């Protein structure tokens, strides 16, 4: 669990252990924050004495931005697990005459420096009795701590108050603590939430935050000689003694950067919080591990079914791309999932893990018969200046790094066009692809498109680039283009061709979007998502368009707002900036042979086997099935 921590902690320390930020189990991903403290001994007393000494030395020299950092810590609900909704549970937000008293439950065996299980059970019983005695008319809430531990919950060995209510674990505890009047805990990390929200914290154990004069302590707190402020304590524990992983570079970073990352996780969960129960229909086994983190964006449960008739009440149906929804009962909500526009360093059909995917509640973005979530974003969102600036910077970096959807490698063209000739690139597409079936009218094949382009540009130097999925043999769509094009390029990479082209003519290929990002003239003959906004020359009228867009607005909608990005190392959601950083180096490799490569089928077999194994492990770990 601490491999990254130990690799990054270069100082000579005696103890390294996980901090309390964004807790998760070992199988869920690497630790993101850890303590690195020179302890005289690996004991609770030594830990407290280190804090005390640091407070005595630095209490008058707290960094000026600690208060702002603490506020961000609370807003991000930094001590809650990744998929918690960062809002107060509805019942606590309602006006009532009764006091709300929160009791935090913990595991019998707690963290590194907690007392033994017997002592902790006794402390919990004492805590329960004290809370009932002090607040006989209160409404009690029991919430389970997210801190790692083993054994039964302490509440299992204790008689609970009559009418006690159980906290809904879908919500972040940090967002609800400000709405209670008292918090009772033995030693849960979430007790810090009470202190940071000015809620009285009643402590019956010896956590690091107790004993400094800011908590109501019901037992001896040895080793505390200082009386520091909450800001000073926070600074010592989470800034001075803690180390944090930078989620973009995967190197040592700052708490501020980690809080940005946690805020992103909260935003994703909030965006997809309605997807609490998802049934994915007819997904191939090799795709399941790749789709899992995206379909789990709402933090609920996910199961795989073979037919739409197997859906249960309250479930969302999930379909891949434009797959047929036949058999789905009326009224069942549905989402569609598809590869994002910054996908990977290999073909999706070669079973390469996707760095981004899109989840659309309305319909596939490549189906012009109906609006999609992307269409709605591009029509209706008032992109603020900072977001447009971010989009411009992202676009510039994508262009600088030569990135596209699949990033198979780079190879410049070897042909040379005659001087003063307009170079027109015609990217091929997969003949049976949904974007062709749904997104074309009249001209529906690459051959017909080449005929049309030659008619429109009789004197141009036309370059035809077959689709890599077709060259690989994974999909159909080979055409005899030699009689219509001046060059049929099967060796160069797409971005190198776009860079030398003057114009790009396409049915609905994503290459048109790549060309727009690079300032090229783009002519469309189908109905792609990027057409119809005033940025392209379109042969067809584009439906569902309400306004014109700038290139930065299109980029903001298509690359910032619409997709989900996933870090397969950290196993958390990430940003497009982080994804392009990881794609950059492998994307620079020399483009290998795609067509006729004899070892490609072997690699596909290995990947299929690996993905099927991962999916089987995931099923076992999560005990697949509805949890209601």
Predicted regions and their residues:
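Catalytic-core helical/loop segments in enzymes performing group transfer/polymerization on anionic/lipid-linked
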Residues: 1-628
């Amino acid at each position: 669990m601490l491999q990254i921590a130990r690799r990054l902690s270069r100082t000579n320390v005696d103890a390294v252990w996980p901090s309390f930020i964004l807790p998760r189990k070992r199988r869920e991903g690497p630790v993101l924050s850890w303590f690195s403290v020179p302890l005289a001994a690996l004991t609770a007393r030594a830990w407290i004495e280190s804090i005390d000494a640091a407070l005595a030395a630095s209490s008058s020299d707290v960094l000026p931005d600690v208060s702002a950092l603490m506020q961000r810590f609370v807003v991000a609900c930094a001590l809650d697990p990744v998929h918690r909704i960062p809002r107060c549970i509805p019942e606590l937000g309602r006006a009532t005459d009764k006091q709300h008293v929160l009791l935090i439950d913990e595991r019998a065996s707690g963290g590194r420096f907690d007392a033994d299980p017997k002592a902790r059970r006794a402390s919990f019983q004492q805590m329960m009795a004290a809370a009932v005695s002090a607040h006989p008319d209160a409404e009690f809430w029991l919430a389970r701590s997210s801190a790692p531990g083993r054994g039964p919950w302490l509440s299992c060995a204790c008689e609970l108050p009559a009418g006690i209510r159980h906290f809904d674990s879908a919500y972040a505890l940090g967002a609800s603590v400000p709405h209670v009047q008292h918090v009772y805990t033995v030693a849960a990390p979430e007790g810090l939430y009470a202190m940071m929200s000015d809620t009285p914290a009643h402590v019956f154990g010896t956590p690091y935050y107790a004993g400094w004069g800011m908590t109501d302590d019901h037992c001896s707190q040895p080793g505390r000689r200082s009386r520091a402020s909450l800001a000073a304590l926070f600074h010592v524990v989470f800034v001075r003694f803690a180390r944090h992983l930078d989620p973009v570079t995967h190197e040592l970073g700052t708490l501020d950067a980690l809080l940005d990352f946690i805020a992103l996780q909260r935003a994703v969960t909030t965006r997809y919080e309605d997807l609490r129960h998802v049934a994915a229909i007819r997904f191939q086994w090799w795709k399941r591990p790749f789709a899992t983190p995206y379909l789990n964006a709402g933090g609920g449960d996910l199961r795989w079914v073979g037919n739409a008739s197997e859906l249960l009440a309250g479930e969302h149906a999930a379909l891949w791309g434009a797959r047929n929804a036949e058999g789905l009962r009326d009224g069942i909500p549905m989402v569609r999932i598809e590869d994002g526009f910054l996908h990977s360093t290999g073909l999706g059909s070669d079973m390469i893990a996707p760095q981004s995917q899109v989840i659309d509640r309305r319909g596939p973005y490549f189906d012009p018969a109906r609006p999609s979530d992307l269409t709605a974003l591009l029509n209706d969102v008032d992109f603020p200046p900072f977001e447009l600036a971010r989009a411009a910077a992202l676009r510039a970096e994508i262009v600088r790094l030569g990135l596209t959807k699949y990033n198979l490698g780079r190879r410049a063209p070897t042909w040379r066009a005659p001087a003063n000739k307009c170079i027109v690139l015609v990217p091929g597409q997969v003949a049976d692809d949904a974007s062709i079936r749904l997104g074309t009218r009249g001209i529906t094949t690459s051959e017909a498109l080449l005929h049309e382009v030659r008619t429109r540009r009789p004197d141009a130097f036309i370059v035809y680039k077959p689709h890599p999925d077709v060259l690989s043999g994974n999909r159909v769509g080979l055409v005899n283009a030699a009689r219509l094009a001046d060059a049929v390029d099967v060796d160069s990479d797409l971005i190198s061709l776009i860079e030398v082209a003057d114009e790009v003519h396409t049915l609905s290929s994503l290459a048109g979007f790549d060309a727009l990002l690079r300032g090229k003239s783009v002519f469309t003959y189908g109905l792609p998502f990027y057409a119809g906004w005033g940025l392209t020359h379109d042969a067809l009228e584009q439906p569902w368009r309400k306004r014109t867009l700038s290139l930065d607005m299109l980029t903001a909608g298509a690359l910032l707002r619409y997709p989900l990005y996933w870090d397969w190392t950290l196993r958390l959601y990430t940003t497009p900036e982080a994804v392009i950083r990881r794609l950059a180096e492998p994307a620079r490799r020399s483009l290998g042979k795609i067509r006729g490569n004899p070892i490609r089928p072997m690699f596909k077999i290995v990947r299929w086997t690996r993905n099927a194994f991962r999916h089987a492990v995931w099923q076992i770990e999560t005990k697949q099935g509805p949890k209601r």
